[in-house]
Amino acid sequence: MPTDQELIKIVPSSRQLAYQATEFYAFFHFGMNTYTNREWGDGTETPQIFNPTEFVADQWVSAAQNAGMKGVILTCKHHDGFCLWPTRYTSHSVVSSPWKNGRGDVVWEVSEACRRYGMKFGIYLSPWDRNKPCYGSGKEYDDYYLAQLTELLTGYGDIFSVWLDGACGEGPNGKKQIYDWKRYYECVRKYQPDACICVCGPDIRWCGNEAGDVRKSEWSVVPARTALAESVQERSQQTDDKEFRMRRITSDMEDLGSRRALEGETNLIWYPAEVNTSIRPCLLYTSDAADDLI
């Protein structure tokens, strides 16, 4: 069992400390699915569907700030593969939409609103892409994903969070991708060294559910094996499953950081938990539940 002296040597990095000081921040789920009344898209949606008429980034960010939040994370691309910025690597993006005649950039507008309001800005870029034909090909798809990740990390100012989802289903070719997490991490460290890599990453741990529920004691000092992206991926949501979204912590779920749990562990890390939950029944807005709040 680790001694007290060994335990107190496990401390947060500067980026982790800054992240934890953020405390409370918004996770904006917005994209193609907002206009299809679906939680998850399948990648076959036409960009012509995407045409926001009342999108005002300043209103979003100011509302978050008025709620006491200190930052914003935006779903720049969800599993359907539709990109909210004019990426150079696919036409399945705002460029092919009627919104602003194909000249709009949701990521830029939200990131700039964050600068104006003194709020931190973070990105969500789903590794799963149900639109891209090369998904499941290995290095070819990883190169594509990294090219888009680089665009976001280099074109939108300081990034405080890179939220890496563990969902890994089939692409349009019926294949699954083995994500090259190591290359993804290296890309983030290269272009945004102060950003925390979250969930399937080494900096911030996911609490394990979308119901906003945590263990009675959610320790930050945990075994290093807890940060293996592959194990996090296995426990992540893999289908559009309402039951998964409402799953809560139960007494038989793994104890991660108590003295008993750390007994016999030789490699410990600082890996604080993050909790995310929706104010609506689903993560995205749907017209049939427009007035429903949890």
Each language-model region and where it sits:
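Mature catalytic domains of secreted/periplasmic carbohydrate-active enzymes
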Residues: M1-A290
